[in-house]
Amino acid sequence: MLEVIILAAGQGSRMQSSLPKVLHTLAGQPLVAHVLQTARALRAERIHVVVGHGAEAVEATVSAPDVQCHLQAEQLGTGHAVQQAIGACDPASTVLVLFGDVPLITNAALQDVVSAADDGIAMLSAMLNNPAGYGRVVRDDHGAFVGVVEEKDATPEQRSVQEINTGVLAASAQHLSAWLNRVDNRNAQSEYYLPDVLGLAREDDMPVTVVCSDNDFD
């Protein structure tokens, strides 16, 4: 069974607007509406939307029988956001995490991520000519995945990496919940980063698969 968690609690400060960023429009629809369509196209059994900034407006936009909203009262990071919804997921389900302001990822790429998570955890990366602002995918000398480092925590060498973390990942609800409970906030932003679960999966000798998207994220 597939469940989707959509993160929609952000403020959209980079858009210089008081409107929640997921409510900005694309092709006449709020960004989050496009992401909901994607979740339904993937035949998700249940859809969870994590709300925060402008919660009432976002909830009104996403309201539907197949959508359950969860409040992130404090903005403590993406890992903390997922924690607000993971407890409502069936432990045996596969959980796909999407961002409510990233509407243009193809269904095929997301299906690849879900399929790759069968035995462990999978994430979606992309190659950018200008990766500024994104977390970087760190690999060893043999090209094997090591982890994701956020830009504010990255070394100059790591900031030169063009492979970025899109934020999309999938894993079983049971494993994801356990890893989230181990994530700490010892980083430059004092936040609980969702990508830290990838490193915890490696520590547990669980397979980590990186699916590289053909989408243009520039």
Residue ranges and their predicted role:
Residues 4-6, 48-49, 96-97, 123-124, ...:
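Structural beta-sheet core signal
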Residues 1-17:
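N-terminal nucleotide-binding beta1-loop-alpha1 segment
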Residues 29-112:
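Conserved N-terminal catalytic core of the sugar/cofactor nucleotidyltransferase
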Residues 108-132:
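Conserved donor-nucleotide/metal-binding helix-loop-beta segment in metal-dependent transferases, i.e.
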Residues 25, 104, 170:
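Short aromatic/basic micro-patch
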Residues 145-218:
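Catalytic-core segments of class I nucleotidyltransferases/pyrophosphorylases
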Residues 19-25, 183-186:
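Short glycine-enriched, charge-decorated loop/helix-capping segments at active-site entrances
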Residues 128, 134-147:
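Acceptor/aglycone-binding surface of glycosyltransferases and processive sugar-polymer synthases
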